[in-house]
Amino acid sequence: MPNWCANRLMFNDISQDNNVLKTWIAGGQPSLHRRARKEGIQLFLAGCAGILRPLTEQCYPPFPQLVAHGMAADNRPSGQAYSAWLAMFMAGAELNVETCHKLHQCWQESLICHARWATLSEPEQQVIRQLYQQKSFDWGDSFRPAPVEAWWDSLCDGENITPAAEPMDFRDVLPTRLDIEVNAFNGGLLTGIPSSYDHYLTRYGCKWPVGYEANICFAGENTLTVDFDTPWSPVGEDVVAALSKQYGGEVDHWFAEQGGNYCGYARYVSGETDVYITDELEWGEADPDDEDSFPDVTGPEWIINNVAHFGG
């Protein structure tokens, strides 16, 4: 398990309905980028197995098997839809709201939802089985992945099950990329494409881009303060800057992680970084008569009472 970095964001002069921000913090609403990821994995496998083929010959050096079956035999709508999805995938499309809707339409019109496991040929099943064995922990989002047959059919049922957004999902603030999401957390599938682990560290500042244990500790008419944790490191500058631009006004950010002995404060105004400082934590003295005692954090002064805890 990681050390946890404690974060506090204080929004001031919020320019839109507070409820929009509260909904994002709470999570639970339909997650378009998670749906695009799930459907994208299925369409990727459909291409690798030759179930779907593009309308024209294609070349994809990161994973040649994706287009190794050549072009479709005719110009039917399912092939048009798959070709449109493939073009966005190969371009590394960012999963913003508009693109996610386009990708979902491609998935629907490809008719891949009707290709349940029992209808696939043995060669098609074998391709999917081999790739799933390689990526099941990433794609199945579980330490105990489902059998490939059940997992594949669950993808076919995706029209009825839209994944829920996680609390404070930073991928809703700065969109991730379709190809990176298919390559997934551990990567190793698409040559030259980052793993989502590496991408998340670069883009969001932390390896799991959501706010854990999110708690709104104050909410006024146009102000809101939320405490949350992130693994190892604070949420990145670009994310908080984007939040300040999206919701207007100013956002103050305090963070601390006592295991790494660091803390920081930043202020963002309408999408721009106004202040950014970091420092080491300051410590009191441990009780010399108690071998189990641990010194208290005593500074810097600006971090005291501005985070819910000091991480670790």
Per-segment meaning from a language model:
Residues M1-G312:
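Intrinsic low-complexity, intrinsically disordered or marginally ordered coil/linker segments
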